[in-house]
């Protein structure tokens, strides 16, 4: 059976939780689905505004609620705003992240790549949340400048 579109799957999961499907939440989901990659709140809000007038604080509250509900997740990048995307329970695919410290581009990584780190942490009693952070990397486009800077 094909996986439903992320917005429809997210709405189903919200209703199953007993959450209300408000217009701002729906707009945030639709906006996020329309954007490439891992947008930050400014990018999400700009896309939400295309769907109808919405205050920035409302967008923040909707993102916060959808993250708390496990519908969305966010990743923290070096000294930059959080980036948002649909959670694995919506897409059916868990992933980790690598973020270029030069340009900020984000690459999705299969979670298996971090399995040794997960096992190392779990053996010591830690519960890693590897999808919530990003490995700091230098992408191929930024590598020449990185080398010139001696990094």
Report the location of each language-model feature.
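Non-DNA-binding regulatory cores of transcription-related proteins
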Residues: 68-151
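Short, hydrophobic-biased segments on the C-terminal half of alpha helices
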Residues: 60-64
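Pre-recognition alpha-helix immediately N-terminal to the DNA-recognition helix
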Residues: 26-31
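Short acidic, hydrophobic short linear motifs in intrinsically disordered regions
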Residues: 39-48
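Short capping segments at the starts of secondary-structure elements
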Residues: 21-23, 34-40
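Short, basic interhelical loop/turn and adjoining N-cap
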Residues: 50-54
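Short coil turns linking two alpha-helices in DNA-binding domains
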Residues: 40, 55-56
